[in-house]
């Protein structure tokens, strides 16, 4: 299984790469040489939960755990393969106790694939495994889209 990672470079061009789940988890376990996450977390208390204006945020990488994508000749993302993962993002967890409580709860669920702290230090990202009624991950984009919509409807009230 691979995650798709995108970013916009300084020439405003979409860059696309894929990383195995193992490589991705190794990579997020430590900060980069510019201490991007550390500096961001220091700035978070000064912001009002609106991170879009944080310096350099547009150059940050964006991760798509739900599916693998490639880029076509026009620079658009094109679906390749579904990973059968839904991302749940729990926000505004202000204390370690709140984060630990959510981590403990999701660790007890058999469908939890992974859970990790968000870049802001105040959120938890949980990847949940999903499949269709036959226990399979859809191979076609339209089928995957329907499965993701169904899964979203089931968990949006959490």
Where are these regions (language model features)?
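DNA replication initiation on ssDNA origins
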Residues: 1-84
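Catalytic micro-motifs at enzyme active sites that drive phosphoryl/nucleotidyl and oxygen chemistry
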Residues: 72-78, 102-119
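A broad structural signal for short, well-ordered beta-strand segments within beta-sheet-rich domains
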Residues: 80-83, 93-94, 112-114
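Histidine-centered divalent-metal-coordination microenvironment in nucleic-acid enzymes
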Residues: 88, 113-140
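Short, surface-exposed ligand-recognition loops at beta-strand->loop->(often short) alpha-helix junctions
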Residues: 89-98
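Helical (often loop-to-helix) elements that flank the catalytic cores of nucleotide-handling enzymes
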Residues: 102-105, 130-158
């Amino acid at each position: 299984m691979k995650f798709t990672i995108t970013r916009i470079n300084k020439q405003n061009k979409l860059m696309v790469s894929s990383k195995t789940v193992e490589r991705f988890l190794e990579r997020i376990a430590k900060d980069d040489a510019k201490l991007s996450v550390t500096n961001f977390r220091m700035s978070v208390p000064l912001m009002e939960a609106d991170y879009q204006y944080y310096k350099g945020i547009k150059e940050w990488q964006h991760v798509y755990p739900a599916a693998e994508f490639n880029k076509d000749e026009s620079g658009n993302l094109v679906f390749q393969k579904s990973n059968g993962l839904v991302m749940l993002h729990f926000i505004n967890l202000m204390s370690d106790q709140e984060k630990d409580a959510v981590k403990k709860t999701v660790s007890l669920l058999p469908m939890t694939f992974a859970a990790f702290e968000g870049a802001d230090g105040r959120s938890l990202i949980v990847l949940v495994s999903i499949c269709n009624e036959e226990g399979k991950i859809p191979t076609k984009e339209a089928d995957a889209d329907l499965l993701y919509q169904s899964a979203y409807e089931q968990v949006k009230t959490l």
